[in-house]
Amino acid sequence: MGLKNLFEKMEPAFLPGGKYSKLYPIFESIYTLLYTPGTVTHKNTHVRDALDSKRMMITVFLALFPAIFYGMYNVGNQAIPALNQLGNLDQLIANDWHYALASSLGLDLTANATWGSKMALGAIFFLPIYLVVFTVCTIWELLFSVVRGHEVNEGMFVSTILFALIVPPTLPLWQAALGITFGIIVAKEIFGGVGRNFMNPALAGRAFLFFAYPAQISGDTVWTAADGFSGATALSQWSQGGQGALQHTVTGAPITWMDAFVGNLPGSMGEVSTLAILIGGAVIVFTRIAAWRIIAGVMIGMIATSTLFNLIGSETNPMFSMPWHWHFVLGGFALGMVFMATDPVSASFTNTGKWWYGALIGVMAVLIRTVNPAYPEGMMLAILFANLFAPIFDYIVVQANIKRRRARTNG
């Protein structure tokens, strides 16, 4: 008996009236993960499209692969030189299970480490965070699905991977579990679940950690996976001394724009490489999963605001001098613009609203980065702020359209 036949034989017990009917969401999630659902349309429909929600989420997940793999490589690429500068590898192996595992696997952690060793070390930091986040999120999704009696939505795959990509590699696992719990329950499930959340769950979870546990999510010691090493992000360096202050934390060499574009600098695991993000972004824009109007609006808002600050200038705030092309490649701007701001649930759905929504994100991101002295990164808060205004933009656009059509009809 094949596996599919086994599922079909078990299915009646999970259907309404069956012995395990309350557990149908769990059965359905496993079955549809392995096989295409047999449900088909029997009547006329307005839209016929092979891209259902499952395939859409899988496409977004796959589009993140360039950022995932480069992020893992960069964790090792930043950590290994720092380790050799500190010279405390034996102490780390004794006190940090990440390096104990790396040592047991025979990874080369010397200055001559290969890209494979760097990638493997990065995976040792990234995969546990992702597995914890995925497991906790799955438990909550299954629990709410069983209680409410609806199917498990595949959006959890995207929420979990995005959350894992926007946190530091050194984040404690229990905080990762707590952050995604907040994002799933408070930002999504209490408002009705999938399709009803007005904020991005991954960003809401990270914002919770930022305000609740700032020492583990920000500062100078969390971005390089080497205990005892302190290295500020490029945004922090610029905020202290302008472009001339940008330098690699280990070698002291200047950070070029190409270094930032490719991602050769410390930061959150999925945010460092603008190049990798744009490769994945091209996929979701081409497949029309991401709205290009939102991305264009973010760029327009960012360019206009940064140019305005450049013209105003400041003798005391170096961030006024940051041009738009540096804003584009530093911090979480690219990842937020391409994969976070374009979330179809929490973003505006009208075409005109998408322009205003995107522009607000671009303006607020630069405004927070430039004017706020306590927090050099502004993309996370800018997107969450714009999420609150997305329904307002749509309401204004819809009402304006109603008035226009009414005037045309009456005229």
Swiss-Prot record:
Pfam families per record: NQR2_RnfD_RnfE
Record's protein name: Na(+)-translocating NADH-quinone reductase subunit B
Necessary cofactors: FMN
Topology with respect to the bilayer: Multi-pass membrane protein
Top-level division of the source organism's lineage: Bacteria
Enzymatic class: translocase
Gene Ontology molecular function: any one: FMN binding
One GO cellular component term: plasma membrane
